[in-house]
Amino acid sequence: MPMESATDTALTFRDATDADVDALVALIQSAYRGESSRAGWTTEADILQGQRTDPEGVLEVIKAPDSRLLTVERAGRVVACCQLEHRGAHAYFGMFAVSPALQGAGLGRTVIAEAERQARETWGVSEMHMTVISVREDLIAWYERRGYRRTGRMTPFPYGDERFGIPQRDDLEFELLVKELV
């Protein structure tokens, strides 16, 4: 059975609202945790169990000043999302999720390109920053193919804070990735 293309049906990009919280939590969870995440390639199921986020965390991003939760719909269904936060000369990219059934079809590439465009045009930023769990070599390689570079700057994983999941290993940390937006 052929994989769906990101361009099979038109995509709609919009800012998330309070009404989107439950759908966004379900999307983010399905993309990274549990058995459903294994349908895609971005699963963290082997390194983290439990939740990836919760309704309060998503609502916090929606409501935060200088922050947007870009929501992507296709045929009326939320299929992807990402956080954009204005931080002075750069924007922060996070909470990125693509429906596992649509991963590998170009949708993620489309979403990140649109997020970069919006950050550049809306805030006039010259860089996009993100943090990725450093052991996620496949995911880091995907970002590198999109122009992001590893900085070697690490921050600790929030061990003991189950809002971010239950670690299955003791060597987790976040690495800062940066891309010049031109």
Where would I find each of the regions flagged by the language model?
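Conserved GNAT-fold acetyl-CoA-binding loop/helix
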Residues: 29-58
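C-terminal "cap" of GNAT-fold acetyltransferases
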Residues: 61, 126-141, 145-182
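Conserved acyl-CoA
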Residues: 110-127, 149
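Conserved beta-strand in the GNAT
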Residues: 71, 77-85, 92-97
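Active-site acidic-Proline motif in GNAT/NAT acetyltransferases
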Residues: 86, 99-101, 105, 134-135
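Conserved acetyl-CoA-binding loop-helix of GNAT-fold acetyltransferases
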Residues: 98, 104-117, 141, 145
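A short helix-loop-beta-strand connector motif used in the catalytic cores of GNAT acetyltransferases and
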Residues: 53-71, 170-173
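Conserved N-terminal entry element of GNAT/NAT acetyltransferase domains
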Residues: 1-22, 175-182
